[in-house]
Regions:
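Two-component/phosphorelay signaling modules centered on CheY-like receiver
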Residues: 12-34
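Hydrophobic residue at a beta-alpha junction
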Residues: 37, 65-66, 79
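Receiver (REC) domain active-site loop signature in two-component systems and cognate sites
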Residues: 61-63
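Acidic, metal-coordinating helix/loop segments flanking the phosphotransfer/catalytic sites
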Residues: 19, 35-56
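His-Asp phosphorelay/catalytic-motif detector in bacterial-type signaling
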Residues: 2, 30, 52-55, 78-83
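Short amphipathic alpha-helix used as the core "switch/output" element in two-component signaling
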Residues: 44-47, 69-81
Length: 94
């Protein structure tokens, strides 16, 4: 079964950064990565996931429309077995 990491972020550069960071794992076929640019697209992908095992969801917190914090309970309700990591590029100022 194919293992999938789903990354949810509205910034287009994120896909390039993640693919570069995990290039060895991706080339070795340890898992695949898919990218959703919004919460609704991520929820659709989660609902349609057949023949793959989602092993991790990483979501940006700050996105237009549905924020990552709004996505979190919906994704957990759909897939309570999948860990979700919230990420952000913004610091807390300290």
């Amino acid at each position: 079964m194919k293992l999938l990491v789903l990354v949810v972020d509205d910034e287009p550069d994120v896909e390039l950064l993640f693919r570069q960071q995990f290039r060895h794992d991706l080339r070795a076929g340890r898992f695949t990565m898919e990218f959703a640019q919004s919460g609704p697209v991520a929820l659709q992908r989660i609902a349609e996931a057949t023949g793959v095992s989602i092993i991790l969801i990483q979501s940006d917190i700050n996105m237009p429309g549905m924020s990552g914090l709004e996505l979190l309970p919906k994704a957990k309700a759909a897939r309570p077995d999948v860990p979700i990591v919230m990420i952000t590029a913004y610091g807390d100022g300290n």
